[in-house]
């Protein structure tokens, strides 16, 4: 692709030839009419909208109505802070930029010593007698008369399974053993 400087483009502008200037003029007029129509539609929509005529000029110089300032209920989305950490861009000596992912939790570095101490004590067996963590059952539910879940009862029932190797080993059916 050929690249031109700004000066070269200005020189070429004078030398260019538009074969049909009436088509270009009609196209420009059509664009202007579309812009005018869009502005008229926006003005019509603005007039239809509820408005008591009481407006003010905001910091950007736009005329705005007051109805957005005194709502009955506060906006739910405006008060939520964005708690996601931004990814940090690291540039190495070669000029490559990599984005490092932020850590998931905000207090990731806070409990490292206690966590390591607890894991070490579990490995050594100081928490429980034989290296396991002992847990007390919830005694209030042990003697309840609550019905047993039927899915657990079905899981405990012994079922006969089909053994394919046994079926291949026998040449005859099981009914002929009598």
Curated annotation (Swiss-Prot):
Residues 61-155 are annotated as: Disordered. The keyword Transport does not apply. Keywords: Cytoplasm, Initiation factor, Phosphoprotein, Protein biosynthesis, Protein synthesis inhibitor, Translation regulation. One of its GO terms (molecular function) is eukaryotic initiation factor 4E binding. GO terms for cellular component: cytoplasm. It holds the Pfam family CAF20. InterPro entries: Caf20. Residues 113-123 have a biased composition (Basic and acidic residues). Its main location: cytoplasm. The keyword Phosphoprotein applies. It is found in: Cytoplasm. It comes from the Eukaryota. GO terms for biological process: negative regulation of translation. Acts as an inhibitor of cap-dependent translation. Competes with eIF4G1 and EAP1 for binding to eIF4E and interferes with the formation of the eIF4F complex, inhibiting translation and stabilizing mRNA. Belongs to the CAF20 family. This is Cap-associated protein CAF20. It comes from Scheffersomyces stipitis (strain ATCC 58785 / CBS 6054 / NBRC 10063 / NRRL Y-11545) (Yeast).
């Amino acid at each position: 692709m050929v690249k031109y400087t700004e000066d070269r483009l200005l020189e070429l502008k004078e030398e260019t030839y538009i074969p049909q200037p009436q088509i270009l003029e009609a196209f420009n007029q059509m664009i202007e009419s579309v812009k005018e129509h869009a502005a008229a539609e926006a003005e019509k929509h603005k007039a239809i909208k509820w408005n008591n005529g009481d407006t003010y000029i905001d910091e950007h110089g736009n005329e705005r109505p007051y109805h957005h300032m005194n709502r009955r209920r506060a906006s739910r989305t405006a008060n939520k802070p964005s708690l996601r950490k931004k990814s940090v861009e690291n540039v190495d000596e070669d000029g490559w930029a990599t984005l490092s992912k932020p850590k998931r939790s905000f207090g990731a570095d806070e409990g490292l010593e206690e966590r390591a101490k607890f894991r070490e004590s579990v490995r050594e067996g100081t928490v429980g007698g034989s290296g396991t963590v002992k847990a007390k059952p919830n005694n209030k539910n042990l003697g309840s008369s609550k019905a047993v879940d039927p899915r657990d009862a079905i899981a405990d029932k012994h079922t006969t399974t089909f053994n394919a190797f046994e079926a291949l080993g026998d040449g005859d059916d099981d009914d002929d053993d009598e």
